Amino acid sequence: MKKRIAAMVLAGAMALSLAPAYGVTEVKAEAGDMKIAMVTDSGDITDQSFNQTTYEACKAWSEENGSEFNYYKPESDSDEARNASVDQAVADGANVIVLPGYMFAATIVEQSEMYPDVKFIAPDVSAGDIC
């Protein structure tokens, strides 16, 4: 588990180091302005896998940076239920939504179009999952 987290952190750092080379502009927001939501996949926040790790990381970061954080568990294991959880998070004021796992591929495509002002973070989702 620790190796997986370290790999994710390193991959993120590498991606950020390339941003200036490709003309990506930096956008800064005050952490206190962020209202972070996490939606679980078919598991819960005690699954000892992506949901739990993501929940713990989001909670710790939010506490350290003074951001509001909530998590949502879909009522069922379906794209519709995951979409409904994202809709609820946005209705509750979330402007950053974390969706851990490939099960969120369809949700990311649909919801990011519906909510262009919301930032979506999708650990363990690749372009191949979305296509």
PLM region descriptions:
Residues 27-131:
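A residue-level marker of the well-folded mature domains of exported/periplasmic proteins
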